[in-house]
Structures are given as C-alpha cells and as structure tokens.
C-alpha cells in the first residue's frame, strides 16, 4: 500500500546530498545538519531550487535514494501547478517511486514483471483496470479499499506519465485520458471516506487527489515530458 512517507524514508546519503548541494562553506554544513533535524525547517530546505537543478544536471550519477529523487521532483512540478500540500506531494512521490518499478505496474494480486517494461504495461492498462473493477464485486471491505486506491493510483500514473502513449492508443479505440481521469477521480473520492484511509491518515490526501486529479495529472505530464521522459521508456538511472 502506498503511503505519504518519502520524507520519512530519506537516507543518510540523501541528507549528505542536501548538505553538499546547499552548503557554501564548512560552517554552512554544520548549520544545515542541525537544521535538517527539525521537520518544518527540513521541509523548507527541500523546496530549495538548487536541489532540483543539481538532480537534473546529474541525473545519471546521483548517490541518492529513489524516494528522495521522486519527492523532490514531484514537489517541484506540483508547486509549479499551484499545489502546495506537502503531504499530497509526498504521496505522489511515493506513487512514482512505487510504480517506477516494472513489477508494480500490475494490480496487487498480479505481480509479474512485464517483459516489455513501461510501454508494454501501458498497452495492457485498460485490460486490468477493467479486471480490478470487476474484482470489486467479490471483494471484502479491506480489499475494496486496496483495489480502489490502486485503481486511482494506477489511473493517475498512466494518464500522468504515459499521456502521449495513452492518447495515441485512444485513436485506435483504447480508453482516452478522460477515461482515466474519471475512473481515478471517482475511486479516490470513494476511498477518501473509507475507515482504512482515516486509520492511515490518508483521508485528506485522497480527497485532494480526487478534487485536483486533473491538475495533478497535468503536473505529471510536465514531469514526464521535461524531466523524466518516461513516456519514451528512458527511465533515469540512479546510483543508489
């Protein structure tokens, strides 16, 4: 299950990257290390534009975690889109980190890595979205939550990262972007009121994703086109 926890999983290498990127002197390094111990100050530091610039200019040689990488980039494009909720940004970062692994491009009960990677998974997207929606008819309440959350997440990922591929396929009869927006939004709305969402402190995140699905999707389009180029199956490599 995806949670809004990228920031809680940053590594020592991530904090070292922040200090090395932002410190101008040895004294700055000491101050930054102290400041990073405070969560509010840390969040403010994570918004520094130099972090994004350094990540983008050294994408193939980064000694950072994938959760740090995707949080910083997701936060950047979402803020550009006027979405400032850090918890929502954290969730989207976790979503990108999770779905960037090929074996997570399928529903929870079908974890077999697609041999043709991202693009192949997009080609089959509408098939197992339909399968998951059908599975809801026989699911328990807990399974219903997990399935609906996954449908919302998957719809956002496909329409956000693979929007050009999705549009091309829609010309040949496959579901279009509007289909994924509608399905994603409605499933996020439904899970927002679920007890499991309250227990996991995700009610506000799901409600925010439902109400701003279109805006978040456009921000991910920007991320895919300008920063990641995942729509062309050119996944950036990280040295982890």
Located regions from the model:
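Polar/charged low-complexity regulatory segments
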Residues: 1-239
